[in-house]
Amino acid sequence: MVKQITDKLGRPIRDLRLSVTDRCNFRCDYCMPKEIFGDDFVFLPKDELLSFSEMERIARVYTHLGVKKIRITGGEPLMRRDLYKLIAALNEIEGVEDIGLTTNGLLLKKHGQKLYDAGLRRINVSLDAIDNELFQSINNRNIKADTILEQIDYAVSIGFKVKINVVVQKGVNDDQIIPMVQYFKDKNIQVRFIEFMDVGNDNGWDFSKVVSKDEMLSMIQEEFDIEAVEPKYYGEVAKYYRHKDNGAQFGLITSVSQSFCSTCTRARLSSDGKFYGCLFSTVDGFNVKEFMRSGVSDDELQAKFEELWNIRDDRYSDERTEQTVAIRKRKKINMNYIGG
């Protein structure tokens, strides 16, 4: 039986994001800049990560509190060995209606078929440019955009539903908006443009680098005949638009200019097993891993999850506009731990 719970702001819980690793094979400046995450950087040892059985248990308990959707994140989740085994286990949980994965796409040909066979059907690929030279400068690993586009084509060919996520930075890749809208329109793949977010302590965020949703929409409307699409469900973060000629859609995510805190239904477990109520958390999360490993029962674990949600009052994006300077000085949790 599902127990309906809400947080301090009346928001239900519907989504669980599981970060399965803090490692990544890219070094994008806004997430894991190479100057900080160099060759000598020490990542979490294996025993500090949640095991697949622990993640399965967490997900199963969360379904009793209303979780229906699970997204696997990182770091780069495809760097976690045997990830397909976790997907298979999550697919067996009663109450889980949807499982998704966010990836940079580099390893899709290597692992995609096993993931599909395990029951994964939806993938979001982070791709910030389709210009090869620009994309190489963004990922700092000399990976061409063409390489990722080939991986995307492969994923689509074996049956995955794919969406593309683009973090837009003014003066960096905002000139990619129109080419990417056109490219993925022709492919009939949804591309979503995300306002550059203030996540973590190392990404050099500055408001002047933000290209707002209204700016992006204006650019796109000058080139394409589009119409707005009604939201599909409560808490949907992207505002979607449809091309009138072929029906292909794209989305704009207003993570900075128009907060969606009031409808956020996500709980997050970091790669080291801590609970966070917000991607922009500024305090260390409750250590679920240690709590579980102390020998608690499922009932005790559920009670703790309920307690953590009941006291949740995170609304960082709302607060940013109210007291930007004070909030920018707070220490935040880096995205490779908490998951995008």
UniProtKB/Swiss-Prot annotation:
Keyword 4Fe-4S attached = yes
Cofactor binding: number and manner: Binds 2 [4Fe-4S] clusters. Binds 1 [4Fe-4S] cluster coordinated with 3 cysteines and an exchangeable S-adenosyl-L-methionine and 1 [4Fe-4S] cluster coordinated with 3 cysteines and the GTP-derived substrate.
The chain positions of domain Radical SAM core read 8-227
Q: Which domain of life is it from?
A: Bacteria
Cofactor dependence: [4Fe-4S] cluster
Which CDD domains would you find in this protein's record? Radical_SAM, Twitch_MoaA
How would you summarize the oligomeric state and partners of this protein? Monomer and homodimer.
Q: What is this protein called?
A: GTP 3',8-cyclase
Which organism is this protein's natural source? Staphylococcus carnosus (strain TM300)
Q: List the top taxonomic levels of the source.
A: Bacteria, Bacillati, Bacillota, Bacilli, Bacillales
Name of the gene this protein is made from: moaA
